[in-house]
């Protein structure tokens, strides 16, 4: 059986931290940002951790194929 390929879309969107958690970037940062406060825009810059264990497990399966 051939090797499994890493999911191209997932590898562009997610990364796994050293402790094994899944890191992702936040949405709503592309356009029409004038109505958004500076604090909100700053908060959107920082990556966050995928909290749901089921989702994180599925993403890891796509990445570590």
Curated annotation (Swiss-Prot):
The keyword Zinc does not apply. The keyword Ribonucleoprotein applies. Residues 1-20 are annotated as: Disordered. InterPro entries: Ribosomal_bL35, Ribosomal_bL35-like, Ribosomal_bL35_CS, Ribosomal_bL35_sf. GO terms for cellular component: cytosolic large ribosomal subunit. Transmembrane segments: none annotated. Gene3D superfamilies: 4.10.410.60. GO terms for molecular function: structural constituent of ribosome. Keywords: Ribonucleoprotein, Ribosomal protein. Residues 1-14 have a biased composition (Basic residues). One of its GO terms (biological process) is translation. It holds the Pfam family Ribosomal_L35p. Belongs to the bacterial ribosomal protein bL35 family. This is Large ribosomal subunit protein bL35. It comes from Gemmatimonas aurantiaca (strain DSM 14586 / JCM 11422 / NBRC 100505 / T-27).
């Amino acid at each position: 059986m051939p090797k499994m390929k890493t999911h191209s879309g997932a590898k562009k969107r997610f990364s796994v931290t050293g402790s094994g958690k899944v890191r992702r970037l936040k949405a709503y940062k592309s356009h029409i940002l004038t109505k958004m406060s500076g604090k909100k825009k700053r908060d959107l810059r920082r990556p966050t951790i995928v909290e749901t264990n089921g989702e994180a497990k599925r993403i890891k399966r796509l990445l570590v194929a």
